[in-house]
C-alpha cells in the first residue's frame, strides 16, 4: 500500500521509496504505486509520483488508484500532473478492497479515466469497439 494503510502499521514515504529503490536494484522496470484502500490524497499522489519519476528516469512509474465518486478526478489529475503515464483501472469500477474502511471506495473506473484523458487531449489508443463489448460483457457478469 503505497500511500498508507488503515492497520496502524508503520508507514512513511521514505519506507515506500526504500522499497521502490530495492525493487529497481533487482531489475524491476515498472512500478505502480497502489492506493489499495483509497486513503491517498491528491497531494500525496502528486508528490510521491513526481519524486519517483524524477529520481528514477529509467523506471516506469504508474498508479493503481482506488477512489470515491467525489475524489477520483483529483487523484487522477495529480498523477497526470506528476508525469505518470501508466494507470490501472477497472471496467465499471468493479472490485475494490474488502479491507477498506470506506464501503464507497472502489477501483478507479476505467470509463471515467478514458473520458478524462480524451477531454484533456491525451491519445489513449483505446479500441472503442472492444471497450464497448467488454463493458457489455462486464454488465452481464456483474449484475
Can you say where each PLM-predicted feature lies in the sequence?
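Catalytic cores and adjacent flexible loops of soluble metabolic enzymes
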Residues: 1-143
